[in-house]
Amino acid sequence: MPSFDIVSEIDTVELRNAVDNANRELSTRFDFRNVNASFELVEENVKVSAEGDFQLKQMRDILRGHLAKRNVDANAMDAQNPEVTGKNWHQNILFRQGIDTPTAKKLVKLIKDAKLKVQASIQGDKVRVTGKKRDDLQATIAAIREAELGQPFQFNNFRD
């Protein structure tokens, strides 16, 4: 029986490259001259530091642009509330990896509501979809791509 897996992963190497490129852009931008601002990658989290809230917003936009250039989906970003310590502002940006249980249940419900002849099962942090016809699986992929669940999904391990 044909099957595929639905996963939600980000490429950590591309994330590191995007953060490095964003830091490089900060050093060349005129509006960030003589400003203590930086991106710091800690595991799969990015710590953004700047001297003001407005600069934090600009830095998030810079990071989004570099993520898009490196083909990392910005929907995986989860920006925490900014914190003020003295004159510096800090913000942690978390990147979601894996599919949590409520999102997996929404995926399974979405697949069942589409009335396609496929079965979906939750297997840890991924969802396995099996069906008799390859066309049904491709219709399932199209339905999931149309749905906005606030998280990027990849489809891998497609088997006939």
From Swiss-Prot:
<comment type="function">
    <text>Nucleotide-binding protein.</text>
</comment>
<protein>
    <recommendedName>
        <fullName>Nucleotide-binding protein VP1617</fullName>
    </recommendedName>
</protein>
<dbReference type="GO" id="GO:0005829">
    <property type="term" value="C:cytosol"/>
</dbReference>
<dbReference type="InterPro" id="IPR035570">
    <property type="entry name" value="UPF0234_N"/>
</dbReference>
<dbReference type="InterPro" id="IPR035571">
    <property type="entry name" value="UPF0234-like_C"/>
</dbReference>
<dbReference type="InterPro" id="IPR036183">
    <property type="entry name" value="YajQ-like_sf"/>
</dbReference>
<dbReference type="Pfam" id="PF04461">
    <property type="entry name" value="DUF520"/>
</dbReference>
<dbReference type="InterPro" id="IPR007551">
    <property type="entry name" value="DUF520"/>
</dbReference>
<comment type="similarity">
    <text>Belongs to the YajQ family.</text>
</comment>
<dbReference type="GO" id="GO:0000166">
    <property type="term" value="F:nucleotide binding"/>
</dbReference>
<keyword id="KW-0547">Nucleotide-binding</keyword>
